[in-house]
């Protein structure tokens, strides 16, 4: 689990003391070997229990586990940087050549994939796959780039026999949401988790007794609070990050994993359907 990433993505939710702790950890990550919770509490003017609660909020058992994990993350990051022939800053500028832009985009996407995969709770992911596999009907919602990710997933699921609706029109999305039934699944894809249209559809789905699965960021959001299950994605936000490129990369890694997991549950029949689909489309050429 990448705690530095979790700290960065959860900043908007921190209290005053939690922000002090977060700032201290990031500023002193290279020197954490010699830092105890007592020493840190004294320096920041807060209680030791506040530090322990902060660690637990991030998913660690206590400060010692968080401290050791941060030390490990810092060391791994240093080794990776030293091993890279060309170290590039993540922000793309108007002066960058196409070669430099290509390298930066590639690195940004690599980071999005690495950080997203590091956050996976695989037991929860397996449970989500099982829930989807039993759904009589699946609705996928999303806007903009997230809608493209949803459409890709819908095609894949239809290939292996699932009944799926993935409509771009928000009015149609809302109409489908209110017609869902108990046992149905809604997969809501939204990095911010705050888009009014997606939240409205999730509310309607829950009201109908459907299971809501959110593919979203770590930040607390209306969608995250509505969802029965969440799958976390991480992506770097920069001024030049147009078209949500790294966000789509992270989201696609999640949806591809869901698809492969569903294929594995019924591999023989799924592979037969994929083959039949391929044979049929070949006849259209």
Curated annotation (Swiss-Prot):
Coiled-coil boundaries: none
Summary of the function given for this chain in its UniProt record: Represses the expression of the murPQ operon involved in the uptake and degradation of N-acetylmuramic acid (MurNAc). Binds to two adjacent inverted repeats within the operator region. MurNAc 6-phosphate, the substrate of MurQ, is the specific inducer that weakens binding of MurR to the operator.
UniProt-recorded name of the protein: HTH-type transcriptional regulator MurR
DNA-binding region: 37-56
Keywords assigned: Carbohydrate metabolism, DNA-binding, Repressor, Transcription, Transcription regulation
TM stretches of this protein: none
InterPro entries associated with the record: Homeodomain-like_sf, HTH_RpiR, RpiR-like, RpiR-like_SIS, SIS_dom, SIS_dom_sf, Tscrpt_reg_HTH_MurR, WH-like_DNA-bd_sf
Every HTH rpiR-type domain range: 1-77
Source organism phylogeny: Bacteria, Pseudomonadati, Pseudomonadota, Gammaproteobacteria, Enterobacterales
Entry annotated with the keyword tRNA-binding: no
SUPFAM superfamilies listed in its UniProt record: Homeodomain-like, SIS domain
Single GO term (MF): DNA binding
Record PROSITE patterns: HTH_RPIR, SIS
Subunit organization: Homotetramer.
Associated pathway: Amino-sugar metabolism; N-acetylmuramate degradation [regulation]
